[in-house]
């Protein structure tokens, strides 16, 4: 559609954004469904976040996606924050509700909705989650909000380790009747034990994504059983090596593409 005097604006806020595919994707959808919206990418550094949100208000933008380095900083300038975004301490989406700017973290919601669409509920379930980065943290928060019984997080003792342990402690305090624990990914015996008692196994690492598409983060196929749901946040390739191996063992599998859509 052509730009009119009523065209409303959406955008991507962060830096760098010049290689983002979001403008092409959103503008294609707006045109396809004849919506009078346009989506632009705005290169905004962390110290420009306040000015960017003021501009958002001034121009009455409908919404925005937030990427690094603004995902934490932006929370200071919003009117409302979703429970999950508050827990995670980061925001990747802003929606303008009649002048009230609300921040959301959609990774966890997308993950849960993707599972639900495939007939899998997390309430009362135990999840083993591989990786402790930003996506993992969002999944942890949303799973706890949706009633997961227990979450076992595995991560290498790298630069993210202390942050992962601290965040899990925050979540545990917020959800005392549920359990969340962080373990060393290199402790293969503990990893095997947790997977064997889990309902859902989720990969929230980059393993399986190019150039690691021929690698699975789980090499012991005996850990796959028919009752185990195996999921992956990686969506390219749509069916990772982990999912291929799990499917061959009879597991129900859920890829990451649906998470992106939801």
Predicted region positions:
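Phosphate/diphosphate ligand-binding glycine-rich loop within oxidoreductases
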Residues: 2-118
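Short, conserved loop/helix-junction motifs that constitute active-site signature segments
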Residues: 3-4, 122-123, 145, 218-227
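Residues at the starts of beta-strands that form the adenosine-phosphate
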Residues: 9, 38, 126, 149-152
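Glycine-rich adenosine-cofactor-binding loop
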Residues: 14, 103-108, 124-145, 155
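Active-site capping/gating segments
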Residues: 113, 117, 235-236, 251-262
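Conserved S-adenosyl-L-methionine
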Residues: 145-150, 249-252
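NAD(P)-binding Rossmann-fold cofactor-contacting core
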Residues: 148-175
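Rossmann-like adenosine-cofactor binding region
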Residues: 177-255
């Amino acid at each position: 559609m052509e730009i009119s005097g009523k065209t409303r604006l959406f955008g991507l806020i962060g830096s760098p954004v010049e290689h983002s595919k979001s403008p092409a994707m959103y503008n294609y959808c707006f045109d396809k469904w004849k919506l009078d919206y346009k989506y632009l990418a705005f290169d905004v550094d962390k110290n420009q976040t306040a000015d960017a949100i003021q501009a958002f208000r001034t121009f009455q933008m409908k919404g925005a996606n937030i990427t690094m380095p603004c995902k934490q900083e932006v929370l200071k300038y919003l009117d409302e924050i979703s429970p999950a975004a508050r827990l995670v301490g980061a925001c990747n989406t802003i929606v303008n509700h009649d002048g009230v700017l609300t921040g959301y973290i959609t990774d966890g919601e997308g993950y849960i909705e993707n599972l639900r669409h495939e007939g899998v509920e997390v309430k009362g379930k135990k999840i083993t989650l591989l990786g402790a980065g930003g996506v993992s943290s969002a999944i942890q928060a949303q799973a706890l909000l949706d009633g997961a019984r227990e979450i076992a997080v595995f991560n290498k003792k790298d630069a993210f380790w202390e942050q992962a342990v601290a965040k899990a402690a925050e979540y545990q305090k917020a959800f005392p009747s549920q359990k969340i624990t962080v373990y060393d990914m290199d402790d293969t015996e503990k990893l095997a034990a947790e997977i064997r008692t889990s309902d859902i196994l989720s990969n929230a690492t980059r393993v399986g994504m190019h150039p690691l598409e021929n690698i699975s983060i789980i090499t012991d196929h005996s850990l796959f059983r028919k009752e185990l749901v195996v999921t992956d946040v990686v969506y390219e390739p749509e069916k990772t090596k982990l999912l291929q191996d799990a499917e061959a063992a009879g597991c129900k599998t859920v890829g990451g593409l649906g998470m992106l859509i939801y």
